[in-house]
UniProtKB/Swiss-Prot annotation:
It is found in: Mitochondrion inner membrane. This is Mitoferrin-1. It comes from the Eukaryota. It is a multi-pass membrane protein. It catalyses: Fe(2+)(in) = Fe(2+)(out). One of its GO terms (molecular function) is ferrous iron transmembrane transporter activity. Keywords: Ion transport, Iron, Iron transport, Membrane, Mitochondrion, Mitochondrion inner membrane, Repeat, Transmembrane, Transmembrane helix, Transport. One of its GO terms (cellular component) is mitochondrial inner membrane. SUPFAM superfamilies: Mitochondrial carrier (SSF103506). Belongs to the mitochondrial carrier (TC 2.A.29) family. It comes from Rattus norvegicus (Rat). The chain crosses the membrane at residues 45-64, 106-125, 143-162, 200-219, 234-253, 301-320. It holds the Pfam family Mito_carr.
Length: 338
């Protein structure tokens, strides 16, 4: 990651927080910021991957119970016992009726996917951003370059993450037939084949690319309002990122609902829609959602999705930025010593 002034303007939505500084100061002149400014102008690929992996694991681990509720609230034909009106009420009922640890079922497979997925995302994004910015803009920051870099990084991220999403969402559903991630993987592989793990991949990409575009535009606008000097300012990055992530999450909820349907293959819902076999394809998912619930169906779970996305983005950026700073500083100190 380049450490230059104007930093965060180049980040892709919801995935990173840039603390770049160059040519002098960035905000307050405490010891921490001075140390930050004295770091080398780029971090290694291993630093980006390690920091990204930590950010992904912590983000998904902390917010996983809310994600479990979101998945259930997006169900098109939920069991009467699994109809919820609020996140708090849902978590309380799930823990009371299904066990204290039930909201965490599937967390292990999510962590296994989030680590490598986020590691590849950050490493790919940082290196492509730097390369493409040199091509498109000699001034150092091109929105086109950042957008292309983010889109390419998303292809890698979702290729790793999609199978984990399929497994964890099936484990999260009410009355799931799967008791563990391993049994779910075996059952899906045996009954539906390898393609089932990527049935929602195109929908995932279709959702994430506009998500990042909306987040990027909103984030840049908010940064101009709260941090016009574009200094390294963790508070402004977290606030702007959280609000931008919330807007992007709300706008892309219809795509997320379709993705959930493709991942979970709700038998009751598909039966009501007269769908035989397995549902595949984003267009078919859109038609099925509308057939069952009308326009309102596209916004099922929007509250949970927004509440999930805001702190997730803040956690991801703050953790990534901390580990990037910490690891780069350690590498610099080791080179100085030896």
């Amino acid at each position: 990651m380049e450490l230059r002034r104007g930093g965060v303007g180049s980040q892709a939505a919801g995935r990173r927080m840039d603390g770049d500084c160059r040519d002098g100061g960035c905000g307050s002149k405490d010891a921490g910021s001075e140390d930050y400014e004295n770091l080398p102008t780029s971090a290694s690929v291993s630093t980006h991957m390690t920091a990204g992996a930590m950010a992904g694991i912590l983000e998904h681990s902390i917010m996983y119970p809310v994600d479990s509720v979101k998945t259930r609230m997006q169900s098109l034909n939920p069991d009467p016992k699994a109809r919820y009106t609020s996140i708090y009420g849902a978590l309380k009922r799930i823990m009371h009726t299904e066990g204290f640890w039930r909201p965490l079922r599937g967390l292990n497979v999510m962590m296994m996917g989030a680590g490598p997925a986020h590691a590849m995302y950050f490493a790919c994004y940082e290196n492509m951003k730097r390369t493409l910015n040199d091509v498109f803009s000699h001034q150092g920051n091109s929105h086109l370059a950042n957008g292309i870099a983010g889109s390419m990084a998303t292809l890698l991220h979702d290729a790793v993450m999609n199978p984990a999403e399929v497994v964890k969402q099936r484990l999260q559903m009410y009355n799931s037939q799967h008791q563990s991630a391993l049994s779910c993987i075996r059952t899906v592989w045996r009954t539906e084949g390898l393609g089932a793990f990527y049935r929602s991949y195109t929908t995932q990409l279709t959702m994430n690319i506009p998500f990042q575009s909306i987040h990027f535009i909103t984030y840049e606008f908010l940064q101009e309002q709260v941090n016009p000097r574009r200094d390294y300012n963790p508070q402004s990055h977290i606030i702007s990122g959280g609000l931008a992530g919330a807007l992007a999450a709300a706008a892309t909820t219809p795509l997320d609902v379709c993705k959930t349907l493709l991942n979970t293959q709700e038998n009751m819902a598909l039966s009501l829609a007269n769908v035989s076999g397995r549902l595949s394809g984003m267009a078919n998912a859109f038609r099925t959602v509308y057939q069952l619930n009308g326009l309102a169906g596209y916004f099922k779970g929007i509250q949970a999705r927004v509440i999930y996305q805001m702190p997730s983005t803040a956690i991801s950026w703050s953790v990534y930025e901390f580990f990037k700073y910490f690891l780069t500083k350690r590498q610099l100190e080791n080179r100085t010593l030896y």
